[in-house]
Regions:
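Short coil turns that delineate tetratricopeptide repeat
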Residues: 21, 55, 89, 123, ...
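Structural signature of tandem alpha-helical TPR/SEL1-like repeats
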Residues: 35-46, 70-83, 105-117, 139-148
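Helical scaffold of the NTase/Pol beta-like nucleotidyltransferase catalytic core
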Residues: 104, 124-130, 134, 138-197
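Conserved catalytic core of two-metal-ion nucleotidyltransferases
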Residues: 173-185, 189, 235-314, 335-363, ...
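Catalytic metal-binding acidic patch
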Residues: 209-230, 308
């Protein structure tokens, strides 16, 4: 039986370690070297040799499973984690990792038992509550999710993390990705879909003259009632819908050749008020729990891509950007549209889930500046929240920035 005990406020959970056989240790060391050298695919074979040499080692199975999940080998990773748990079902780290993998594939019933056992074993570890909060969030159990995210941050306050300078990926503005954007917009237009460049994609085009180098996906907007037509068009042109999405809006697709993700967001008009709304919403929960943004009438005009093909675009892109970002002309690397959009409809339970989860994740990774920015964005809406005030004060001290109180958003 595991002798794991989570220390007070410990952010992460580790496996119970036992001595690894010399042969397995050799292969594990080589796998870690290959990963450090950016050869993750080659490391897979070394992990396999390691577990073959020491098949009852829980820590090896856990590391191999986690590696496979990181390589998008979902089912193979799950298989290794399941074997680790069969070897020791009281080890919190494999329970949490497998619970996350089940949650990511919407196997909520299977995830529940694992995560509840992890809470029993490692309930004083902040990471346990973060993962359980995410599990609840995906199912639309937002009040309980918020409670666990808050518990994770409360425990994190007891175990501060040092600041790091994270390396930003800055190669999204490749010519082939930009060509893919224009080609996709044209394909959608020809299929009868009124799709337009939106969010970070639009910001890059208008402000920088191209895609933002540190962006991570292509963002398109369209009328909500055209989402299904857009999905059929995208699938017919080399995209595959990302499986196991929990929200009905937006919808995400992966380009199978270029491995680029596109987020397609539906904008809906309230027939009574005439107001346009966009956001992240889940079916079967109260409407006010969802994350929504409010827009004036969105007007599109016909245009042409750089190669002359027909597309749709916003009639007044600068006004659209101003509604979302405020001062969109000044780069702000810490701006997070999900929680800081200027046109948010309040600070709903879902928005709180994203805000609390992102504060935690950035803090845990050592990106304290972004964690602090997320805390301050949250305080604009919840200025008297004692936990957020304490988090903001702690992060301010850790980043040598003066603590500040933000006035409530209008």
């Amino acid at each position: 039986m595991s002798k794991h005990r989570a220390s007070r406020g410990k952010p992460t959970v580790t496996t119970t370690k036992r001595q690894t056989s010399p042969a397995a240790r050799k292969h594990l060391k080589e796998a870690e070297r290959l990963i450090a050298a950016g050869q993750s695919q080659a490391a897979t074979a070394q992990f396999q040799r390691a577990v073959d040499a020491d098949p009852t080692n829980v820590d090896l199975r856990y590391k191999f499973g986690k590696h496979l999940l990181g390589q998008h080998e979902q089912e193979l990773g799950i298989l290794q984690l399941e074997r680790a748990i069969r070897l020791n079902d009281r080890d919190a780290a494999p329970l949490l990792e497998l619970g996350q993998a089940y949650t990511a594939t919407n196997r909520f019933a299977a995830a529940r038992g694992l995560l509840e056992k992890a809470l029993e074993i490692a309930g004083k570890a902040s990471q346990t509550h973060l993962i359980y909060g995410t599990f609840l969030h995906k199912q639309g159990k937002l009040p309980d999710a918020v409670a666990h995210f808050r518990k994770a941050l409360t425990l994190m306050l007891e175990c501060p993390v040092e600041a790091t300078v994270p390396k930003r990926k800055e190669d999204f503005d490749k010519p082939e990705v930009e060509r893919l954007l224009w080609t996709t917009l044209s394909q959608l237009a020809l299929a009868g879909v009124h799709a337009f460049a939106a969010f970070g994609t639009l910001l890059g085009i208008v402000r920088e003259g191209g895609l933002l180098p540190f962006d991570k996906d292509i963002d398109l907007g369209l009328p909500h009632n055209e989402l299904d037509l857009a999905a059929r068009c995208l699938v017919a042109n080399g995209w595959a819908e990302v499986p196991h999405a929990f929200a009905v809006n937006p919808r995400s697709f992966l380009h199978l050749k270029l491995q680029v993700t596109i987020d397609v967001t539906g904008f809906a008009v309230d027939q009574q008020s005439g107001t346009t709304y966009e956001g992240i919403w889940i079916e079967g929960i109260p409407a006010e729990w969802n994350r929504l943004t409010r827009w004036d009438t969105i007007s599109l005009v016909k245009a042409n891509a750089p190669d002359g093909s027909p597309i749709w675009k916003l009639e007044d892109p600068e006004a659209w950007l101003r509604t979302l970002y405020g001062d969109w002309r000044t780069p702000d690397p810490d701006f997070d549209t999900i929680i800081a959009a200027k046109n948010l409809c309040g600070f709903s339970l879902m928005t709180q889930c994203y805000a609390l989860g992102r504060i935690y994740a950035r803090w845990e990774s050592g990106n304290l500046r972004k964690a602090l920015a997320a805390a301050r964005h949250s305080l604009r809406h919840l200025p008297d929240d004692e936990l957020l005030l304490e988090v903001e004060q702690r992060l301010s001290g850790m980043t040598s920035e003066p603590s500040q109180r933000r006035e409530s958003a209008a």
